[in-house]
Amino acid sequence: MVIYGYIRVSTREQNEVRQLNALGGWGILPENLFTDKQSGKDFERPGWLDLMGRLDRGDLLVVQSIDRLGRNYTEILEWWRYITKDRQADIVVLDMPLLDTRAKGEDLTGAF
């Protein structure tokens, strides 16, 4: 299992330090941390696409907040399903503990 982190800031002027600090305790190796400095309006972002090319079954993707993935609910949902169903990887959203797909069960945990 590889632990990946994803950070996105909307503009080059914004600072990714807050998100980097939030991911700090997860033991993410520098080569497994992907950053984009652009809008979340779509998923055509180089860091995101590179990450999706590496994510594999049993891996874990950690993000600080769901809005760091993107701004379009439908596209977030499509990518969420792709990661968890097609790639069979897990996702943890740090500021929303219910969005942790590692906890498999009958409740809403991880169901997006």
Language model regions located:
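Short, structured surface patches at the beginning of a domain
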Residues: 1-112
